[in-house]
Amino acid sequence: FDGRPECVYVTMNRKKDSVEVMTYDLDWVAHPEYSVFSDHYPCASLDVPRPENLDFMLKMAADLAEGFPQVRIDLYEVGGKVYFGEMTFTSNAGMMSYFTPEFLLEAGKKVTLPL
């Protein structure tokens, strides 16, 4: 949100028809109440280790997101190295059924569009 990371969305153990997911706050506390889990998006373990490069990744995400009202920054940590994936401006075409309506409403309140 204009260069301010608000949460970390973790995807792991990706398979052909599913990927485990969990949302964390910036202090690395899991928030399963933010997600709608399903067969396609099952709950990841609540004790996913904090990435060793999380502070660097959050700084990188903030720098890349600066100036954009909302953007998802995909970063990956593999073997202690950080990799950039993509910047997405309309995650899942805006139809993110894997988040609760309450979470989406709160996220939407953080978006400030230029007039």
What are the roles of these predicted feature ranges?
Residues 1-6, 11-16, 71, 76-83, ...:
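Short, solvent-exposed loop/turn segments at secondary-structure junctions
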Residues 25-82:
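A long amphipathic alpha-helix within ATP-dependent nucleotide-binding catalytic cores
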Residues 81-115:
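C-terminal active-site "lid" helix and adjoining low-complexity regulatory extension at the edge
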